[in-house]
């Protein structure tokens, strides 16, 4: 048995159910049904095991975690175990009664997604009427209770020019931080890549908007910025390094090195119903496979950044090259790097196709029906 340093944080994807239908969602295409979700006892056990390992943070996510009636109980359990608790939410489910319960349970932070500052644009992306006004009310309720608030704003070709407005919204809503993140193309985001890909000019404009706001605002608002990989020369480290800092639990109880890992065919993902979290983290095939540097191809082995970017994203390597064990094709050392850039430029210059909205197949309406 090998012993790896414990992860810093655990992401609990409590459910794939969600009132929104965002076409950039990173959830898998095959969404877990309600009947497949792990029960309260299973999630409580997971939190206990995480605390016993030395994990410090528990992030409650989904789907929409506020659709789980046991969420306050799970937050209270995390608090009792000494885990920092963070809620990642759409803000359109649960309302103030649930928020009161979560505050009483010891919730320490809220991350609220915002699709756009333009109400019509927000509804179009979310597939949900009056989404922005609902989120505004939720943000006000969060701040009225004294909870720290982070705004998560996802960028794409349809809203990239509104970064200044998103930053202004974060200030208006009294957020302490905003994450301005370009779409990452996994799950539904990959399926909708051609509909979402911004141009290089749009990317440069978003960079300028963020840098300008940072200079003007100073410490009034923390601004994180995530670029789209397809225009990069160097890859980002996968979750701080595959199997090194982060562990993701799917609604079914599968233990994943990252939220998109299930796209890697042929890889075995262990389940908490069958094996302990510590054993999976230390010895599970999915975690050992790409942990460290021994797995890396020769071009990565000789790179001075091999322990900085850790070879980039395994899921992206698979999606773009067909091989999860090769270097991330967004790296300039990749033989298909130029093809990746060319694909992004071609897609962004072409008319955007209709969105494929994030819905279970049996519920998937036509795009034109989403807002009727």
Curated annotation (Swiss-Prot):
A molecular-function term among this protein's GO annotations: iron ion binding
* Cross-referenced PANTHER family: PQQA PEPTIDE CYCLASE, RADICAL SAM DOMAIN PROTEIN
Q: Which PROSITE patterns match?
A: RADICAL_SAM (PS51918)
S-S pairs: none
GO biological process, alphabetically ordered: pyrroloquinoline quinone biosynthetic process
- Tell me which residues make up the Radical SAM core domain: 4-220
Which residues are noted in the entry as [4Fe-4S] cluster-binding? 18, 22, 25
Q: Does Oxidoreductase appear among the keywords?
A: yes
The pathway is:
Cofactor biosynthesis; pyrroloquinoline quinone biosynthesis
Similarity comment text for this entry: Belongs to the radical SAM superfamily. PqqE family.
Q: Which UniProt keywords apply?
A: 4Fe-4S, Iron, Iron-sulfur, Metal-binding, Oxidoreductase, PQQ biosynthesis, S-adenosyl-L-methionine
EC numbers listed for it are: 1.21.98.4
Which cofactors must be present for this protein to function?
A: [4Fe-4S] cluster
Sorted alphabetically, which Gene3D superfamilies does this protein's record hold?
Aldolase class I
The name of this protein is PqqA peptide cyclase
Q: Whose protein is this, by species?
A: Xanthomonas axonopodis pv. citri (strain 306)
Subunit relationships: Interacts with PqqD. The interaction is necessary for activity of PqqE.
